[in-house]
């Protein structure tokens, strides 16, 4: 009988050794360990999940778990395979094909770290050994994970795992406290904190509670209006230091968060998280009314207004209500007279960017919209739409008084004056 422990496919790091690896190598380490464990599971050899796996799934540093507990907490964590489970001639073949199929000629010893490193300086050899593993993997690591549902390929198995959850009908992670189901383990971990974290610092103004006193202090500035963090570049002030750090990247152009799939970089980690959904196809925000799903919460919030008919944004001047704040902002320019969009050719100003765009065609003499019936061209798409009614005979504007229909809205307005005159002269 052969015995295979998780240590046989595990790499162990001290804090000093971990610091010697760059971010790409750290990501590679996570992917290798998670993939190896997943392959053990697929062979039916993994009985218990080591703490190291839980640590890696939560993107924590691997050395923060006690070394012995991380890879050998349970005696049953040793994986036994006998002739009844796997015949002797299958053990080598199955293990090499499944566990090592992506690592080419890499020996298992390449996945083990020497234990005689006593200082940061000594771990340079460790890093070069890991670089060897990186080189061996890089040749076969491009788009190695392919989805059998939609055929998409992924460079990183962590992204592939998230993508696979989209097709899973069952929401596999269930909260024992409230019964909520989560598809992604990361979402499940985040949700559990609602129940486990004790929030002992409470705001006296609004009753909101926080787990840290520093968070409460930052929150209080919402009520006081205090903005102690000032940008030296432009003088803008902020309530939180983290917001100032993000703002400074506008001046420096720094984009520290890079997408591993397409290489696009972002200023904020939240922007990178949102962007990744383009690659994974994940749409976590679902409408309860029509089941339509969205990648971003802001899109779901806009969509919900269709069902509710709610118009939460009201103009203080005339009382007109709007579904979206952007529409209210544009409307307010009617009252203020603000015209922020100026033509560089003639200096004429406009309230909307779309109006300026249409105006610029006067100078360029561009008429991009052509009628397929008579070949007449127009500067604006709306003019082409109005013109087409000559050919179709469509009359969408109907008078409520007499039922007469008109092709254009301006004709309906002119027609309505007939009825208003009749009412004025009627005794």
Curated annotation (Swiss-Prot):
Keywords noted in UniProt: DNA-binding, Metal-binding, Nucleus, Repeat, Transcription, Transcription regulation, Zinc, Zinc-finger
Highest rank taxon of the organism: Eukaryota
Keyword Chloroplast tagged: no
Domain KRAB intervals: 4-75
Zinc finger (C2H2-type) residue numbers: 145-167, 173-195, 201-223, 229-251, 257-279, 285-307, 313-335, 341-363, 369-391, 397-419
GO cellular component, one term: nucleus
GO biological process, one term: regulation of DNA-templated transcription
GO molecular-function terms, A-Z: DNA-binding transcription factor activity, RNA polymerase II-specific; RNA polymerase II cis-regulatory region sequence-specific DNA binding; zinc ion binding
Localization in the cell: Nucleus
Keyword DNA-binding: yes
Family: Belongs to the krueppel C2H2-type zinc-finger protein family.
Function field: May be involved in transcriptional regulation.
Protein name as it appears in the record: Zinc finger protein 736
